[in-house]
């Protein structure tokens, strides 16, 4: 029991709370953000992923606008409160620590730290996707002309993609 408690205590509570939220598959019901969906049916004509991953693979729903506003905010507060109450018993803390965990200010600060962990992961997800998306490589004049037409048209996949990214990240 002591070794398990020591192992748990070695991870910050906010990390353990965020980990629990992920294990609960929070946001799994929210569609992932994908280049294919965001850029529309012409996406494969203008985009590719440097990693070779398909354009249909993207950001988990948890890390979208709806994931944050419709799932994370309320779930984070609830799971933080629950785990803060469980924490003293799980780790075998003395009574004064129990009282501190029940303090509203401490709970608010802990919720803020959980939000920070979420946002750090959010940024990593988005940076990884955006760094991986690039324009297709056109190796002849005909392909370059077609690429330019697709990019400059009224329903440009590039414009659609950028608008969708802005919508999801602001």
Which functions belong to the PLM regions below?
Residues 1-170:
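Cytosolic/nucleoplasmic, non-transmembrane interface domains of endomembrane
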